[in-house]
């Protein structure tokens, strides 16, 4: 189990990657307590003084001008949670819910939400007990925050809704009992504070970021293997080429290929005097394409790290000034655009991989046996595996369409522009799965090509990468049932086994 002390506003991407991967034991920095208490006191003072403040003693959305009587304030907070729990579809994975809850705890604990520490402590206890609310994946437009997903999370605090514990769906009441909790009666503003925020969108986008980083590392390894298998040149990775263009990420991408390929190898020396002048773009322009993808990954990482530590509630309590101010931090446009950029990177990583794989099976370009198998005609080799890769690459082109440019008014036109950040982040999982499948096919093909170059060998790192695959998948001496081999290669990549072959500091959370 991963242990994490939350210092509000200070979560790192590396910590969040661990939260997304492992059950987590949370604790909260005790220095956060005073700010939370003061913030909650400001809300209590509003009630005591009889002021009218949105979200505390008013309705919500288009009903914001409706004043709520003091006797109904507890009912108001309970009602907003139950009425907004209107999601649909399959439940989020436990890992996504855990990440979302950690983000919510981090935001609330900063002391701008007017919520009592006991509510935050209850969320922490649920995470520590590995009790995860059942949250439908669909139903949020990413403004006013992720209302439906966060409402489903919050129903469990009331002893309502459903949760999952050790793979079993249980009632909210049972979930609280397992976590050693009793149902909470929410104080004024607490229901709205729980529901307003970008944490579902950000959790999906962070998962997409972590997947994109893993894919980037895998694709760089596969690309370097393909260079060797196709008797490609190392010259396109010369640092001087990339230095004069000036893009930092392109320079770093080229460095990663040099790191893998080393100065030379038996295979490299075997074609020193060949007649080929230039390699096809899918080999030669890898630093340029992958460098651009790396830049999008890094840009998105910066945005998502800020958002992960942000306060996206509304209204916000500024206790030092005694002010409660309504704004729009719940609007997840930054998250949506970051996710859209990740979608571009994930799609292009897969698209370039498919082209390299297509090159390998083309004997005219690669100087390898047609479709990477002997006795062609009797054997079809990798012929249809490339078709599968092409299908996945084309599917990703559709999924990469920007979600952030879409908007549909909600709440009787009070919420008349929305971000669609939740979908923007959620579809990244499907895209990553597609790209991983493409890379799995290339990995199989590149390893096959390298074996055809025997007895010549590649660099130590490339040989190690091939060895990891060969522990699970044998060389193709003739046609056999292909799908299980793709599945094994896919599983290897899903384990992110090639991340450690990357230079340090290349990828933000690794």
Curated annotation (Swiss-Prot):
Q: Might you report a single GO cellular component term?
A: cytoplasm
Q: Which domain of life does the UniProt lineage start with?
A: Bacteria
Q: Which residues carry this modification: 2,3-didehydroalanine (Ser)?
A: 144
Tell me one Pfam family matched here. Lyase_aromatic
What does the entry's PTM section describe? Contains an active site 4-methylidene-imidazol-5-one (MIO), which is formed autocatalytically by cyclization and dehydration of residues Ala-Ser-Gly.
Per its UniProt record, what HAMAP family does this chain match? His_ammonia_lyase
Whether Ribonucleoprotein counts among this entry's keywords is no
Enzyme class, first EC level, given as a word: lyase
GO MF terms, alphabetically ordered: histidine ammonia-lyase activity
Q: Which PANTHER family match?
A: HISTIDINE AMMONIA-LYASE (PTHR10362)
Key word Cytoplasm present in the record? yes
The biological processes this protein is annotated with in GO are: L-histidine catabolic process to glutamate and formamide; L-histidine catabolic process to glutamate and formate
**Name recorded for this polypeptide:** Histidine ammonia-lyase
Compartments in which it is found: Cytoplasm
Family listed: Belongs to the PAL/histidase family.
Q: What is its EC number?
A: 4.3.1.3
Can you locate the 5-imidazolinone (Ala-Gly) cross-link? 143-145
